[in-house]
Regions:
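DNA major-groove recognition helix of helix-turn-helix
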Residues: 160, 172, 210-212, 223
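Alpha-helical bundle regulatory/interaction domains
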Residues: 1-153, 163-168, 182-187, 191-202, ...
Length: 243
């Protein structure tokens, strides 16, 4: 699995708990839970996708996950944490049972949405300044974003990192990486040099280096493996290892 700028909630309604691997040499892995919060990550991770089960989940907007969980987003960044660590075991098991008994996907989405909305009276909303910063960082350098918000560079880094779980610079790089992934998937005939130039990389080497730092593979290898979004099939990726 490749990194992205958003935290996510996943609830498996059957099968085994989510299993992650420490690396290619790890043949056992670690079972996390059926209900998991995936924090914002800036590196790829290895997940077992062989045990298919019905699943429902949420991808949070930047900064929103921490609001719904009642803790700073940076406190669970870079990790996968059982949902009951935030909501309590009884509440999570009741929610999972209700989701499993629902007759259709649309109903499951409604149930999960209502579960999140019920928490709104107990949480603080996402700081509008953080929302604005996230939008500005998609197109502007960090220094100009700080100026636009009338914040110091240091204050922007501290506030944004706590709310989103990534530094502003790292967030901006991951946003660009996400745009590149989308284009690689949707425009298979477009050359890598053109994609690199349009994304604002200095040259092809810069593009390859940045892409590999997040994914562990080159853009060409990703395209050859048939990657879709943040997913690279195990059997198709280089060295045939899990990702």
């Amino acid at each position: 699995m490749l990194p992205a700028v958003s935290a996510h909630l996943v609830i498996r309604l059957g099968g085994k708990p989510m299993r992650l691997f420490a690396g290619d040499a790890d043949e056992v892995g670690e079972f996390i839970s059926h209900s998991v919060i995936g924090g914002v990550r800036d590196a790829a991770y290895l997940k077992d996708s062989s045990d298919f089960a019905p699943t429902v989940g949420v991808v949070f907007r930047p900064g929103a996950a921490g609001a719904f969980l009642g803790v700073p987003t940076d406190s669970f960044a870079g990790s996968h944490t059982p949902l009951d660590a935030f909501w309590g075991q009884a509440e999570v098991e009741n929610l999972r049972s209700e989701l499993a008994e629902a007759p259709a996907l649309e109903r499951r989405i409604e149930i999960l949405e209502h579960a999140l909305l019920r928490r709104l009276p107990r949480i603080r909303g996402v700081d509008p300044a953080i929302v604005q910063a996230a939008l500005l960082l998609e197109r502007r350098p960090v220094g100009k974003v700080a100026t636009a918000l009338d914040w110091s560079h240091r204050h922007l880094i501290a506030r944004f990192s706590e709310a989103v779980g990534l530094s502003p610079k790292r967030y901006a790089r991951l946003v660009r990486f996400g745009r590149v992934l989308l284009r690689l998937e949707r425009q298979p005939e477009t050359g890598l040099a053109e994609i690199a130039q349009d994304a604002g990389y200095a040259d092809q080497a810069h593009f390859n280096r940045d892409f590999r730092s997040f994914s562990g593979i080159s853009p060409g290898e990703y395209r050859k493996a048939g990657g879709t979004g943040c997913h690279v099939p195990e059997q198709n990726r280089p060295e045939n290892s899990r990702r």
